Regions:
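ATP/NTP-dependent adenylation/nucleotidyl-transfer catalytic domains that generate, transfer
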Residues: 11-14, 177-179, 183-263
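ATP-dependent adenylation/nucleotidyltransferase module used to activate substrates
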Residues: 1-184, 263
């Protein structure tokens, strides 16, 4: 079993750990146990967390010496109404469909936007502001290189906001390494993260990053009220056929190119 690296944590007086309580974060949180007495554990609530995750985080947080639940932007629904749905549909990583969907009448009534904009305002900016307020001397992250295999050293430097006082204890771990650690230490996870699924479940309203049909099925089965709110009450049902129409239009071009290459 691989070991975590916590270089510099002994000297740190105010370490901070942003924890989603997913598998990676939960593994790192377990490894942090010897230093939890001085580590600020921060749960970044994007406003669209699955209810069981939010409850799990706060219940777990009650037993931590230092814990903060940060929800700077409030409910995701307010942002959806004013700024649009976080969506980013790509075709084989060749061109995004967001712009073409935006001009359709049905979709324009509800608006869509890049999911990265949503992430920045609901996760990264609140994290930055809280860090400026708390002034930690060591940043701890559960990020892994496997999550971003094409990122360069410069990319990782940017993600660290230029600070040198940061550590990623499981940076070189694989998914299998993480699950091996979790199983060996019998670490419990919130219901939403227990399925060992490959999609991301940080926000039930996200239609962008790592979207899978299993994630939508899970929402319908476990949280039917939220599913109905997304696809009925809030009008997303109107966007679905628009997305399909644009998707078919885009793929038809590349199918045509493939046929030309075969001639």
């Amino acid at each position: 079993m691989k070991e975590m690296r916590f270089d510099g944590i002994e000297k740190a007086e105010k370490p901070i750990f942003y924890c989603s309580f997913g598998k990676d974060s939960s593994a790192v949180l377990h490894g942090l146990e010897p230093w939890l007495h001085k580590t600020m554990v921060v749960f970044l609530d994007c406003g669209g967390m699955y209810p069981d995750i939010t409850k799990w985080a706060d219940d777990y947080g009650k037993g931590l010496p230092k814990y903060m639940h940060v929800n700077a932007e409030g409910s995701i629904w307010d942002a959806i109404r004013s700024r649009g749905w976080p969506v980013d549909v790509s075709v084989a990583n060749i061109g995004k469909l967001g712009a073409s969907v935006m001009i359709e009448e049905e979709a324009s009534r509800h608006k869509v936007r890049e999911y990265t904009e949503c992430i920045n305002e609901r996760i990264w900016l609140p994290a930055y502001v809280f860090s400026q307020m708390y002034q930690p001397d060591l940043f701890i992250s559960g990020e892994r290189k496997e999550d971003r295999p094409f990122a360069t050293k410069e990319d990782w430097a940017i993600r660290t906001s230029g600070v040198k006082n940061s550590i990623r204890p499981i940076f070189d771990w694989t998914d299998s390494d993480v699950w091996e650690y979790i199983d060996a230490h019998e670490i419990d996870l919130p219901k939403t993260y227990q399925g060992r699924q490959e999609d991301r479940r940080d926000c039930f309203a996200c239609l962008g990053h790592n979207l899978t049909i299993d994630r939508i099925k899970y929402l319908k089965e476990e949280y039917p009220d939220l599913f109905n709110k997304m696809f009925t009450e809030e009008g997303l049902a109107e966007i679905v056929p628009v997305m399909i129409r644009n998707l078919k239009r885009s793929t038809s071009v590349w199918e045509g190119i493939a046929e030309l290459l075969e001639d």
